[in-house]
Design a protein with these regions (language model features):
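C-terminal accessory subdomain/extension
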Residues: 91-200
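Active-site loop/helix belt of alpha/beta enzymes
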Residues: 1-93, 157
Length: 200
């Protein structure tokens, strides 16, 4: 119809890790473009970050998504990390529990540090007792269930003090693998209203 003017056309791909499937989709999309371009020359927008690996030079735009975070391709490096600070250091004795529901019970005297981030900030709760952070360049293990606004780490035999910097997160793939979800879910669940994201 001459009353319809195409300003643009776009598509999305459902399995960009599979070249055969994706190339078939690209060819179908190109067929539609050839029909439309007989009358119009629309803006052509195609797929997301991984489309840079395909022959799509007929498109005007590619939507960069997760690649902006430094993920999706092996040649990219993560550009984001989350840092916090130690807000409290205290000792517990053998048999004492840490956090809700007896999520961790000490088998010896231990020194514990509190970090003021929790699942409200996007740390998956099923990482409880199953991830490490860096304090003063040393890896320390989380203990107990992650709380809404806090988590705890074992800093026994570590010389640290309140205010020391904590690197909580610098690679979404590590967390995603541990809890069997995608790095997309880790990244989009981070709560930037409470968390300052540091971009290298």
């Amino acid at each position: 119809s001459k009353k319809i003017k195409f300003e643009g056309i776009f598509t999305h791909f459902y399995k960009t890790d599979n070249e055969n499937i994706t190339n078939k989709q690209i060819n179908i999309f190109k067929d539609y473009i050839n029909i439309i371009e007989k009358d119009f020359y629309p803006i052509i927008h195609i797929g997301g970050s991984k489309m840079v690996n395909y022959n799509v030079d007929f498109a005007k735009y590619v939507r960069c998504g997760i690649s902006l975070y430094g993920y999706g391709e092996k040649s990219l490096k993560p550009v984001m990390k989350i840092e916090s600070k130690v807000i409290k250091v205290f000792e517990i004795g053998k048999g004492e529990n840490v956090g809700y529901q007896n999520g961790f019970i000490a088998d010896k005297k231990m020194k514990i540090a509190l970090i003021p981030l929790g699942y409200a900030d996007g740390i998956p709760r099923n990482l409880s007792n199953n991830f490490k952070v860096k304090i003063c360049g040393k890896n320390v293990k989380s203990i107990g269930y992650i709380c809404m606004d806090l988590f705890m780490v074992d800093v026994s035999n570590k010389n640290l003090q309140i205010g020391d910097k904590v690197c909580v997160f610098d690679n979404a793939n590590e967390w995603a693998k541990k809890v069997n979800i995608t790095n997309y879910e880790i990244l989009t669940n981070l709560n930037n209203s409470r968390t300052n994201l540091l971009i290298d």
